[in-house]
Amino acid sequence: MTLHTMFPTQVYVSHLRQAGWLRFNRELLRECQQVREYDVAGQKWCRDNYPGGYTSYGSLCHMQKMSSTFATLEQKINRHVKAYVRALEYDMSGRELTMTDCWINIMPQHVVHGLHIHPTSMISGTYYVQTPKGCSGLKFEDPRLDSFMATPPRKADCRPENKPWITVPAQAGNVA
């Protein structure tokens, strides 16, 4: 029997580690907290739609164009995006990837970020500035699940690539 793996979902996880990343994270955290404090429109939206948490998604979603700190984050992340694109073997001849959106999510304990997709993004990711000990990770689900309604459950010890979902641990300094 020959078994081929076709159409895999490849998840990129790496540490941003560059000299001074802890200092950079402290500056980024300070700026995130300042934005949350002054973003009245974002606060109003979050009161109704993101109880206990804060997101600048609906109010300030181009942070990389508004802040030199976030512009620096974009530069650091671009290195990882390029590595991911190479690993996926995309032909980028004559094409350029640009960060279109960059926003802040602050999720204290018991705040959840529900399942959602980014249908207009080629690559979507998260950078963790700060994560509390024991926090939940980033859950990825098989995008074909709606086609598997009659499929029996997976064995508890199945290989990660056969699971219907996986959770990547959230860790400060990681790009996922």
Question: Whereabouts are the PLM-identified features?
Answer:
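Catalytic core of non-heme Fe(II) oxygenases with the double-stranded beta-helix
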Residues: 98-176
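Non-heme Fe(II)/2-oxoglutarate
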Residues: 1-91
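Active-site region of the double-stranded beta-helix
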Residues: 62, 68-98, 108-122, 129-133
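Residue-identity detector for glycine
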Residues: 20, 42, 52-53, 58, ...
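Aromatic-enriched hydrophobic runs in primary sequence
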Residues: 12-18, 84, 95-96, 112, ...
